[in-house]
From Swiss-Prot:
Main subcellular localisation: cytoplasm
One Pfam family, short name: ACPS
Cofactor dependence: Mg(2+)
Molecular function, one GO term: holo-[acyl-carrier-protein] synthase activity
NCBIfam families: acpS (TIGR00516), pantethn_trn (TIGR00556)
Transmembrane regions: none
Catalysed reactions listed for this entry: apo-[ACP] + CoA = holo-[ACP] + adenosine 3',5'-bisphosphate + H(+)
The enzyme's E.C. designation: 2.7.8.7
Binding site for Mg(2+): 5, 50
Example GO biological process: fatty acid biosynthetic process
Task performed by this protein: Transfers the 4'-phosphopantetheine moiety from coenzyme A to a Ser of acyl-carrier-protein.
Full protein name: Holo-[acyl-carrier-protein] synthase
C-alpha cells in the first residue's frame, strides 16, 4: 500500500506562529515535538502522517488520527514509524521518505501488512 502527501511549509509555519506549541500538539506527540526544530521538520512530519493514513486506506479521521501515528528518527536522522504505530495498525513493514524543497514538504510511505 502506497501513500503520498505534500504540504506547504508556510501553511504549517502560519499555524505555529498563530497558535504556538498548541498547534504542534494537534498533530505531533511529545517525542516528535522534541525532534522538530523548524516549521520545515514539522511540515515533513505532517506530510508523513497524511501519507501513512492514505497508504492505510483510511485518511486522517476517527480510524487513524494524527496522534495515532508516531515518527522517530534513527542515529543518522532517518525518519521511521515506531513499532507502537506499526503494531496498532497490524503493519509488518513500513518505509518512509520525507523531502523538502521549494517551500513544500513531501512524504512517501509504503506499508506491508
Amino acid at each position: 500500500m502506497i501513500g503520498i502527501d505534500i504540504v506547504s511549509i508556510s501553511r504549517i509555519d502560519e499555524m505555529i506562529n498563530k497558535f504556538g506549541e498548541k498547534a504542534l500538539k494537534r498533530f505531533l506527540n511529545e517525542s516528535e515535538i522534541l525532534l522538530t526544530k523548524s516549521s520545515q521538520n514539522a511540515a515533513g512530519f505532517w506530510a508523513a502522517k497524511e501519507a501513512f493514513s492514505k497508504a492505510l486506506g483510511t485518511g486522517i479521521g476517527s480510524e487513524c488520527s494524527f496522534l495515532d501515528i508516531e515518527i522517530s528518527k534513527d542515529q543518522k536522522g532517518k525518519p521511521f514509524f515506531t513499532t507502537k504505530t506499526l503494531n496498532k495498525f497490524n503493519i509488518k513493514q513500513a518505509d518512509l521518505s520525507i523531502s523538502h524543497d521549494g517551500g513544500f514538504a513531501i512524504a512517501a510511505v509504503i506499508l506491508l501488512k
